[in-house]
Amino acid sequence: MATQVATPLSPSYTSELIIVCHHVLQHSPTPLTPHSLSFTQGFLLGQLSIALLIFFFIKFFIFGEPPSADDRSLHLNSLRRARTLAHQQSIKQLRTRSNSISLSLRHKDSRSIIRKGEETRGGPSIATILAKTYYNVKGHQPESLDWFNVLIAQTIAQLRADARQDDAILGSLTEVLNSGSKPDWIGEIKVNEIALGDEFPIFSNCRVMPAEDGFWYGPGTTGTEEGRLQARMDVDLSDVITIGIETTLNLNWPKPLSAVLPVALAVSIVRFSGTLALSFIPSSSPPSTSTTTPNPEHHRSNSTTSSSTSPPHRPTTLAFTFLDDYRLDLSVRSLVGSRSRLQDVPKIAQLIESRVHAWFDERAVEPRFQQIVLPSLWPRKHNTRGGATEDVEASEADLDEEVILEEEEEEEEDGGYTLPVPPQLRHPSAASTSLEAEGAKLREAEIRAGVRKQERPGMSRAQTSREEGVRYRPKPVSRTSEGWSGQKGMPGALAPGTFR
């Protein structure tokens, strides 16, 4: 069997084959590596996810439909009720603890100046008050409060009329909003719209009942006092009370005022309904610390010690609060931007509404309440009014006293000769007051014309007349005049030396 021997390739053919292979390798497409393929897919996926996030944020967060007013009201009422119940439970625990402590430290008076009534401690009980006023809490029908609505409507109408006369209320609100601490990213706030409404609140369904725990239990109480009576009434207001403001949102990064975004807001109260609770909190005085020790130093030390340990005096106050089932409907209009503007953004309305509810809850919704200190109801002379003549005399009493004192000083400087003023002239009428005013105007005109010298401060009329060369001689006192001179006593009389 013959063997085949491979013939070797020629050098020229080998070189051509190498050139062809090199050319094929250069022009063939480069295959994609796994690393480059995964980077491209990740980049595209990231861009798509960012776009989806922006889309959902704008659609559901900014332009999403807010829940209905009924749903929001129910949710807020449930939250407030839970807070009220928790507060009442804590008040009961605190009262039980304070009662156990104060039983052994109760103060006992050595004697009583005013005879006590049926109750040996504190005021009358709720049952006694209701029995003596013939009021049955369970059987008494609620009152309509029509008379109270008329009085409140007159007061509100007068306040609205005073506010519409000038723009003082706009300036006051602008000053209040810009005062105090304000974030740096909020610019100057300007009030550009205000509407006080045309309707009036209607109070109805008034009933009297014992006050609940926590309503009258304030910082000045010890928890051992008896219960109080409270009056509850329904309040309903359907009106449009609007306040509109303009401001700017400032972007202070990376440098101050890098960007400024104009914002215009208008908040309107559309409806308010709730239950108002009123209660009187009587005054409380510290216990008496009088002793029979004749030593003043010992008495001073006892009074100092007792004043440091006794509770402070609490005046009589009127407390009011709203129950947690109230409803407050707001309407918020917004305009954000300068060129491309966003109008009535729902999320901005929700944020403002939540802030308004929180502000009101922190001040006048149970368990929190407002206290107004009542003035003394004891009849006083300076508070007495009535009758046209009496009103004029009361308003001019202070002025008359000053005029009488000035006349007495002038007479003393004139040589010590005093003239008694008749009692009927100590309180001049309105006509005499107008005559005195005309006389003062005439004297001012003479001073401006140069006929009369102006009185220097600290000099009386008598001294000024002496400088002018005029000398006055006191008139004798007769029996009929009884020391009264018509030159000085007549109302509206001109001063001596007026005409030369």
From Swiss-Prot:
It is a single-pass type I membrane protein. Residues 1-42 are lumenal. The chain crosses the membrane at residues 43-63. Residues 64-500 are cytoplasmic. Keywords: Endoplasmic reticulum, Lipid transport, Lipid-binding, Membrane, Transmembrane, Transmembrane helix, Transport. Its main location: endoplasmic reticulum. CDD domains: SMP_Mmm1. One of its GO terms (molecular function) is lipid binding. Residues 283-316, 406-500 are annotated as: Disordered. GO terms for biological process: aminophospholipid transport; intermembrane lipid transfer; mitochondrial genome maintenance; mitochondrion-endoplasmic reticulum membrane tethering; protein insertion into mitochondrial outer membrane. It is found in: Endoplasmic reticulum membrane. Residues 406-415 have a biased composition (Acidic residues). GO terms for cellular component: endoplasmic reticulum; endoplasmic reticulum membrane; ERMES complex. It holds the Pfam family MMM1. Residues 283-294, 302-316 have a biased composition (Low complexity). Residues 141-375 form the SMP-LTD domain. Residues 438-471 have a biased composition (Basic and acidic residues). Component of the ERMES/MDM complex, which serves as a molecular tether to connect the endoplasmic reticulum (ER) and mitochondria. Components of this complex are involved in the control of mitochondrial shape and protein biogenesis, and function in nonvesicular lipid trafficking between the ER and mitochondria. The MDM12-MMM1 subcomplex functions in the major beta-barrel assembly pathway that is responsible for biogenesis of all outer membrane beta-barrel proteins, and acts in a late step after the SAM complex. Homodimer. Component of the ER-mitochondria encounter structure (ERMES) or MDM complex, composed of MMM1, MDM10, MDM12 and MDM34. A MMM1 homodimer associates with one molecule of MDM12 on each side in a pairwise head-to-tail manner, and the SMP-LTD domains of MMM1 and MDM12 generate a continuous hydrophobic tunnel for phospholipid trafficking. The SMP-LTD domain is a barrel-like domain that can bind various types of glycerophospholipids in its interior and mediate their transfer between two adjacent bilayers. Belongs to the MMM1 family. This is Maintenance of mitochondrial morphology protein 1. It comes from Phaeosphaeria nodorum (strain SN15 / ATCC MYA-4574 / FGSC 10173). The lineage of its organism: Eukaryota, Fungi, Dikarya, Ascomycota, Pezizomycotina.
